[in-house]
């Protein structure tokens, strides 16, 4: 058989990977390549969502040379306008992306304005990303409301001053201040309503020139009626001359009400004082009756005590009269072994033995005498 040589097949050339020197170098180089690939992958990932960039979702470069997804930048701009790495303002190099970011911010501002205008209570946001435009709009609306309240308060103050001047200028009182008719109250309400409407139609603060009285013609435009009070004829413009005849009647009505209230209060005070006096008299009468009853009871008690004393005295006299017979009865009773003595209403029985030969002691009566 022929000899086959395998030297060519098993010859390890310098470029063969099975060479130990070359194998070690190739493994180290592959490790470096993998590490560099990992670094590139981390560098090519978005810092907000930590996901790599793809062809469908490419990276968007900012002015600070940081790359993010466009959607991540839009979502981040809802919270802050600064870069999350270097804290600089978001400025995109791509003009189309920058326009899209600006449009999103404008839309967000419009939504916040609509929400703040629709809700009656202002919403306090917890974030610090308030824009100057939003703050200016809020301050302007607050200023408008404040000025509106001020103008309304000034208008009301002018109305009150004008009404007080009309009431204080008149010093005419009604003919009978103690009586108030329902028609007077109706006229008062009518006057107040008409004056309020006229003041609303006129300027809130009248000028001094408009307050000057105009000449009045011979025919009076306000006829007086005994039953209905005063009637007001409608005029084209409210003036001081047309309102001056109203003021005496308008002022006389409050004065009449005050006088009526004063008279009623005086009557109430008198009735209260009279009722107090009646109560005091009743209490005194009851006390006198009780005293008389107590005196009668004392008299009866004294009479009873006197009767009892007389009865006791009679008993004493009767015991004195029958003193001898009582002694005889006691001597006879000793023979049988018992001794009876009478002392008022009390009877004492004492037994004594005859064998000892004791002598009977004389018993004392209530009056202090011995029998």
Swiss-Prot record:
Keyword Cell division: no
Tissue: Expressed in stems, flowers, green siliques, cauline leaves, seeds and roots.
Stretches annotated zinc finger (RING-type): 46-87
Pfam families reported for this sequence: zf-RING_2
Region of interest: Disordered: 199-254, 348-371
Record's keyword terms, sorted: Metal-binding, Transferase, Ubl conjugation pathway, Zinc, Zinc-finger
Composition bias, Polar residues: 200-225
Reaction catalyzed: S-ubiquitinyl-[E2 ubiquitin-conjugating enzyme]-L-cysteine + [acceptor protein]-L-lysine = [E2 ubiquitin-conjugating enzyme]-L-cysteine + N(6)-ubiquitinyl-[acceptor protein]-L-lysine
Presence of the UniProt keyword Ribosomal protein in the record: no
Pathway where this protein functions: Protein modification; protein ubiquitination
GO biological process, one term: microgametogenesis
GO molecular function, one term: ubiquitin-protein transferase activity
UniProt subunit comment: Interacts with KRP6.
Protein name, per record: E3 ubiquitin-protein ligase RHF1A
Gene name of the encoded protein: RHF1A
């Amino acid at each position: 058989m022929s000899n086959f040589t395998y030297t060519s097949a098993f010859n390890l050339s310098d470029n063969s990977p099975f060479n130990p020197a070359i194998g070690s170098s190739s493994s180290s180089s592959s490790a470096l390549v993998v590490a560099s690939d990992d670094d590139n992958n981390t560098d090519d990932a978005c810092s907000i969502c930590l996901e790599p960039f793809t062809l469908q979702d490419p990276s968007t470069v900012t002015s600070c040379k940081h790359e993010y997804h466009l959607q991540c930048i839009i979502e981040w701009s809802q919270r802050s306008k600064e870069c999350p790495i270097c804290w600089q303002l978001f400025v995109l190099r791509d003009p189309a992306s920058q326009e899209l970011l600006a449009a999103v911010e404008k839309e967000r501002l419009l939504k916040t304005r609509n929400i703040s205008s629709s809700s009656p209570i202002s919403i306090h946001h917890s974030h610090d990303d308030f824009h100057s435009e939003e703050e200016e709009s809020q301050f302007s609306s607050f200023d408008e409301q404040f000025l509106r309240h001020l103008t309304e308060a000034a208008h009301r103050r002018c109305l009150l001053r004008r009404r007080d001047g009309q009431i204080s200028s008149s010093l005419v009182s009604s003919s009978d201040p103690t009586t108030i008719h329902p028609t007077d109250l109706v006229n008062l309400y009518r006057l107040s309503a008409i004056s309020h409407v006229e003041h609303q139609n006129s300027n809130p603060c009248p000028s001094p020139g408009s307050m000057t009285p105009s000449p009045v013609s011979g025919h009076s435009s306000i006829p007086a009626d005994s039953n209905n009070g005063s009637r007001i004829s409608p005029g084209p413009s409210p003036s001081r001359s047309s309102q001056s005849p109203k003021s005496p009647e308008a002022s006389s009505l409050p004065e009449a009400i005050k006088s009526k209230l004063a008279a009623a209060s005086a009557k109430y005070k008198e009735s209260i004082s009279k009722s107090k006096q009646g109560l005091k008299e009743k209490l005194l009468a009851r006390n006198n009756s009780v005293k008389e009853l107590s005196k009668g009871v004392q008299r009866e008690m004294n009479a009873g005590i006197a009767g009892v004393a007389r009865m006791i005295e009679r008993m004493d006299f009767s015991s004195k009269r029958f003193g001898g017979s009582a002694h005889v009865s006691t001597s006879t009773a000793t023979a049988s072994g018992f001794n009876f003595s009478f002392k008022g209403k009390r009877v004492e029985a004492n037994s004594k033995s005859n064998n000892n030969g004791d002598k009977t002691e004389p018993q004392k009566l209530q009056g202090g005498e011995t029998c």
